[in-house]
Each structure stands twice: as C-alpha cells, then as structure tokens.
C-alpha cells in the first residue's frame, strides 16, 4: 500500500484543531490508514490503493475535520465562474485531457511537497505508472489561456523540468530522467502528446514531464492543473480530486470548458448520489442504527445525507471517491464513522463445514493410480526458464509469466507445462538405470488476458517413460491403465507437436474436450537433454479429466 508522509503542524493548520500522537493514532485507522510512525512532527501511514484522496495532507485534513466535529457534510470548495475553454485534440492513443484552474492559493514548501506527493502516489497506483492517468500542476502566471492539448511532432522543442536548456521531445525521452523512465508510453508513435498555451508556449509533455518555465513555487498564487488519460472516467475523477485538494490550500476553483474529444465542463464538482437502506447496518455490520444516527455518521465522513423515507437515506458523496461503487461501500463509511473499535466481534457459525477442494481429492486419486501403474512421483519447482520450456523442446517462444528481477536465470518464469522438467530430471538420473517411469501432478501458469489477473492456472498430470525399446505404445498403455481405473473413456486424434516425432504423437480427447497430449520425444530434444534412450511422454489437463469422471458419477 502507498506510504504517505505528512507533518502534524500542517494537519493542525488545515484542520484548525490541536492534534497529538494519540489523536492521530486513534483517527487514522478509522479512515483505513495504518499508522507506521509518529515521531515529533512527522506522521507516516499507509493508505489503501482505492483511496487516492488520502495520499496527502489536503483531503486527509478534510476527513479529520469530520471525525473531530469541526465540519460535517460534503467538502465545499469555493467555485467561481468559468475561465474559458480548453481545446482537446491529442493523439489517438492518449485522447483525453481535463483541466482546472485554482486561483488564490497560498503555498509554502510543505504545501508543495504534499501536492507533489499526491501527484506521484496517484501516478503509481490509480494512474498505473502514468499509463492510465498522468497529472501536471503549473504556475498559471505566464500561461496565456486558452490552453490546447495537441498531437505534436517529436522534433518540437521545450525546456523540460529541471533543465536550463531546450531540447526536442525526442531528446527529452533520451536525456531526461522521466523520459527514460516513462518514454515507453509514447515511443513508437509518430506524434507525442503536448499541452501548449494560446501563444504556443509548451506547458507540458504528458505523461513525461512539465516545462521548467511554469514550475510551481512558493510564490505561485494561481495553479493550472491538467490530467491526461486513456480512460475518460478516470480522468474526470482525478481532475476533480486535484481541484479539491489544491483548493484546500485556500484557492477558488475555476472550471474550463473542454472542446474536442469531449464537450463538457472540467472539473466536475457535483457529487454522486446513492440511496442507502439502513437495514444494511444490521445485515452487514451487526449494528442497530436508525436513520438519524446513520445520517449523522455519514455527515461526519464528509458526505451529505438526509432521510429519504421508508428506512432509507439519500447520500451524496464527492465525485472523486473512486472507491464507492455500491451501497455496500456506504455501509463501510457508516462503520468507519461509528468506529471499528466500538464494534464487538462475534463468532458467526459457518454456513457449511469446510472441505477439501475437489481438485485436490481428484489429484490424490490420480497420484495413487500412477503409483499403482509402476510410476515414481517427482516434484519440481513451478519456477523454471524459457530456454527449458521452449528452446530445448524445439518450440517457439510464447508469452509467459516472468519475474522482473530474477536471482537466477534458471528460475525466471512460471512453467507453462511440466514435461520439460521431467526430461531434465531424467537427464540427471541416467546413472539410475532403465527403464525409468516418473510422473508429476502440479500446476502451470498460462498468460490469459481474459482473466482478472491475466493468468490462468491449470492442474496438470505429466508422465515420462525412458528405456531401450520404449515406444508410443508404452505411453498409451499408461494412459489406458489410468483411464480404466477412473472408468473414463478417451480417444486419440492425430496431432503435430515440434517436441515429438511426427506421426508418433496424438491428442488425448475426452467427452469434456481436449485432455492433453502423448508422444515419442523428438530425437533432437533427446540430444538437447543428453538422453541416449527413447522417451515417451504425455501431459493431461486434470480438470478436464475430472469433469469426465464427475459426469460419469452423475450419470451412474
């Protein structure tokens, strides 16, 4: 979780309340923040990934005001008249830009540090390392409105942040630290994102760096904020978040009218609305809290709330609250306002007794079956190398799950199949004599963009038989013996696979679909592993075989 550092004295001046270590340690956990350290004026805490509004002192102080009883209800920054328009005609791969002006802020070194911290923490988390969202803050003095978000030539020149000389955008990607770090987000495209003012002066090269000419300093009184994004909803919420945060430092928000990719006013300052049924207090929290108490607690959590009749509450919450997706999230706010420490734990009887996962039960049966067929079980690490899985097996490289900074080249990726590791084991066991019959039941990891975590895990059963005179028949005999024990039928279909001899390899097909492959290992693969006898190997998808087995039981 993001680690945030704030100053106690800064929180005191923003809240208008006296704070000490005890108060901080009491209140921050009620905002789902884990206090790591309070040392003198330094407060260090962890905030959750879904609460970017807690990544700096500005909005943290707003919530502390609610818990301390200083203020309640929605935070209401001053909002003035629109400043004009902003033209949005950026590159297609990063099409959206949102802007806000905040006038009359009062900044010192700590205020600037907090806003920069908020910017970087949002970049790393919600912004997906600037890929999804990037933010810029500028001294508006010297910028002539309206601003434009455009697609620019890589040869366009600017003075990047921290540099005293101008360079082309292409040079920024090569020489500026942020260009080196984030250049991959724009490299390969013919045009780069750029923000310029009405006179054509470069304000920013998002998502890389800002212009040195418009750096925010302690003398800055008017701030221009931009958010560029690949997702319009994400951009809207983050520009609203930053407008609120900067306004906490004493400013007035001035919207801009977007023209181009979107036609709307930015930032959005109006709240979201949801109707909350107070019966959820008991159902989810075990608390008997009526409408009036629920309203009071939600207002303390900096939301507007009022009775809506029939045991319901109309709730309005800040648009930048990206963590609120459902009335269940409002129940969490009620719990936070009430105080987690006041909720007494209760042991809830389980709805059903625990049980072993069916896949584990079935895998154990397969292990016993293979042992009964004369195989010896082995276990390999799930970590392996691409060279073993692909190069040694005569396969083209495919997407795999890799470790970013591996300690050892032999263990830099998660395996996508098990047979290569069995061959490696046989290679190191040549002294043990033949025939050798080994198997392993374990998991593999296959990249799959359709999954939430982009990885599909499969349980596999792999086996190998090595020895003089070993042929495909030996592999088929093992398969038939195993399937006969399960009472499951299968058939073989012609297959092609570079790791096996052509014409001596087959797909194993069941009623539930393809279950795996079996074949005689290709001579070149044997050479790659230093094996001097024929080997037949196979690998099955355990879940497919289990479906057939369970279907047979269901039909019995």
Curated annotation (Swiss-Prot):
Taxon lineage: Archaea, Thermoproteota, Thermoprotei, Thermofilales, Thermofilaceae
EC assignment: 6.1.1.20
Name by which UniProt lists this protein: Phenylalanine--tRNA ligase beta subunit
Organism: Thermofilum pendens (strain DSM 2475 / Hrk 5)
A single Gene Ontology CC term: phenylalanine-tRNA ligase complex
Family designation: Belongs to the phenylalanyl-tRNA synthetase beta subunit family. Type 2 subfamily.
Subunit details: Tetramer of two alpha and two beta subunits.
Principal subcellular localisation of the protein: cytoplasm
Gene3D superfamilies, sorted: 3.30.56.10, Bira Bifunctional Protein, Domain 2, Phenylalanyl-trna Synthetase, Chain B, domain 3
Protein's cellular compartments: Cytoplasm
One GO-annotated biological process of the protein: phenylalanyl-tRNA aminoacylation
Catalytic activities: tRNA(Phe) + L-phenylalanine + ATP = L-phenylalanyl-tRNA(Phe) + AMP + diphosphate + H(+)
Signal peptide: none
Transmembrane segments: none
Alphabetized UniProt keyword annotations: Aminoacyl-tRNA synthetase, ATP-binding, Cytoplasm, Ligase, Magnesium, Metal-binding, Nucleotide-binding, Protein biosynthesis
Pfam families: B3_4, B5, tRNA_synthFbeta
Domain of life of the organism encoding this protein: Archaea
Residues binding Mg(2+), per UniProt: 323, 329, 332-333
MF terms (GO), sorted A to Z: ATP binding; magnesium ion binding; phenylalanine-tRNA ligase activity; RNA binding
Co-factor requirement: Mg(2+)
